Amino acid sequence: MRGKCLCGGVEFEVRDPPQRLYQCHCSLCRKQSGAASNAAFIVRSEQLVWLAGQELVSSYVKPTGFRSDFCSKCGSPVPNPLRSTSYVWVPAGLLEEPVGLSVAMHLFIGSKASWEPTPVSGALHEEVPAFSEVLKGLRA
């Protein structure tokens, strides 16, 4: 499974990807993505292979630790390591080919944008479940 940013400068491949993703509806993810929710999945660090443009990746880290990596040319969010883990967050919107991913869960559903309808598929969570439960849900 391959992906790249809007300008094509940053490219990556995900090996043995999950078949499911999550959508986060928190205000940080809305601001980071510019959309009503942020669709993504999580993989082990060794499953992500950078193919091009790693030198174009810039990071913004809030004092709370929230991190957003992005292409310094086009601004697209790009994969970034999850703090204190051996996992990487991968934004699903960067994927190149049709991948058939389904939504396993919605996070921070109580914080969803007022214009966004309540999702009808996937588990609904008011906050983030334990990390092990998120991983389990993405692999189910």
Where are the regions that the model predicts?
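A short Gly-Trp-Pro
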Residues: 1-140
